[in-house]
Amino acid sequence: MPPCPPQPNRNRLPQLPTGELGEMELTWQEIMSITELQGLNVPSEPSFEPQAPTPYPGPLPPPTYCPCSIHPDAGFTLPPPPYELPASTPHAPDLPYSYGNIAIPVSKPLTLSGLLNEPLPDPLALLDIGLPVGQPKPQEDPESDSGLSLNYSDAESLELEGTEAGRRRSEYVDMYPVEYPYSLMPNSLAHPNYTLPPTETPLVLESSSGPVRAKPAVRGEAGSRDERRALAMKIPFPTDKIVNLPVDDFNELLAQYPLTESQLALVRDIRRRGKNKVAAQNCRKRKLETIVQLERELERLGSERERLLRARGEADRTLEVMRQQLTELYHDIFQHLRDESGNSYSPEEYVLQQAADGAIFLVPRGTKMEATD
């Protein structure tokens, strides 16, 4: 906090004695001399006497540099510089500047030898700055005929864009080559030629067809094989008649045409395998019908079970109601029963039992009444 400035209408000197004022000035001068010797930068407060202004030292002399080439030869090593930048001047001491309570130190002077000895960045690392990190994003199939894709484009336009982008990249490399002022590497690495990685071709995923049933294909092959064999053997009637005709009609058909032994053997083989095929189809049909009937019977039994469960629940509820009514009637009867003294019977000590003839008796608990015919 800065000290309060003195007011013009008030005199501060008469407030302190003359002896104490002189001692304070001497003490203050000693403190200032100690801080100057130690090189400390302590914010000073205005003293009672004004200080003399310090003379202006004048501008600093500009440094001079020796002429040197910026681009030295590849096989020439630069000698150390004959001089360095002046580290400090007598007129401007290297003390940290103070702004309030913050001290800012002065950086060390830079020298030309330090700049030359500093390692240059790796050219491969500089090239990686402009390249994208990670694997390139795979492009979509240009031959896709899906009209729902938002990134849909023709294959020809993609090829034109690819060639245009490659041409622009090559022109950019030609216009802005990578050069370095100091070649501290061999001549092969002084001017490297970098080739861009080839663009990955999009993977075309073929749509897998659904599962193909083997049995229908076998049946079709068998039918076509029988037809081919019949045509090769010059059978005069189609294979459908051979398989589907009854026995009598089939025998009459064979009697109408004069056939050789090989033709008869082929016809009988075709009929046998066709009948086996029809029998297998009928067997599968009967199995499917049986499965359907069993499913229907199972559904019927499930619905019947649910109906019986509902009926059992209703019977249990009815039985519970009857038990409650019987208990109420039991207590009501015991309330009306009296002994010879006029006292009521306790239902915990006596029970009501009915005989075979319908008579009701009041007996103590634990005793059994003999059944009377």
UniProtKB/Swiss-Prot annotation:
Region annotation Required for interaction with MAPK8: where it falls in the sequence: 1-83
InterPro entries recorded: bZIP (IPR004827), bZIP_Maf (IPR004826), bZIP_sf (IPR046347), NFE2-like (IPR047167), TF_DNA-bd_sf (IPR008917)
Domain of life: Eukaryota
UniProt-annotated stretches for the region Leucine-zipper: 291-298
Glycyl lysine isopeptide (Lys-Gly) (interchain with G-Cter in SUMO1) crosslink site(s): 368
GO cellular component entries: cytoplasm; nucleus; PML body; protein-DNA complex; RNA polymerase II transcription regulator complex
Post-translational modification as stated in the protein's UniProt record: Phosphorylated on serine residues. In undifferentiated erythrocytes, phosphorylated by MAPK8 which then leads to ubiquitination and protein degradation. Sumoylated. Sumoylation is required for translocation to nuclear bodies PODs, anchoring to the gene loci, and transactivation of the beta-globin gene.
Motif (PXY motif 1): 61-65
Subcellular location: Nucleus, PML body; Cytoplasm
Any one Gene Ontology BP term: labyrinthine layer blood vessel development
Main location: nucleus
Assembly and binders: Homodimer; can bind DNA as a homodimer. Erythroid transcription activator nuclear factor erythroid-derived 2 (NF-E2), composed of a heterodimer of NFE2 and MAFK, possesses transactivation activity on beta-globin. Also forms high affinity heterodimer with MAFG; the interaction promotes erythropoiesis. Interacts (via the PXY motif 1) with ITCH (via the WW 1 domain); the interaction promotes 'Lys63'-linked ubiquitination of NFE2, translocates it to the cytoplasm and inhibits its transactivation activity.
Function: Component of the NF-E2 complex essential for regulating erythroid and megakaryocytic maturation and differentiation. Binds to the hypersensitive site 2 (HS2) of the beta-globin control region (LCR). This subunit (NFE2) recognizes the TCAT/C sequence of the AP-1-like core palindrome present in a number of erythroid and megakaryocytic gene promoters. Requires MAFK or other small MAF proteins for binding to the NF-E2 motif. May play a role in all aspects of hemoglobin production from globin and heme synthesis to procurement of iron.
Domain notes: The PXY motifs are required for binding WW domains. PXY1 is required to promote transactivation of beta-globin and for hyperacetylation of histone H3, but not for binding to the HS2 promoter site.
UniProt record similarity statement: Belongs to the bZIP family. CNC subfamily.
Alphabetical list of PANTHER family matching this protein: NUCLEAR FACTOR ERYTHROID 2-RELATED FACTOR, TRANSCRIPTION FACTOR NF-E2 45 KDA SUBUNIT
Protein name: Transcription factor NF-E2 45 kDa subunit
Species of origin: Rattus norvegicus (Rat)
Name of the encoding gene: Nfe2
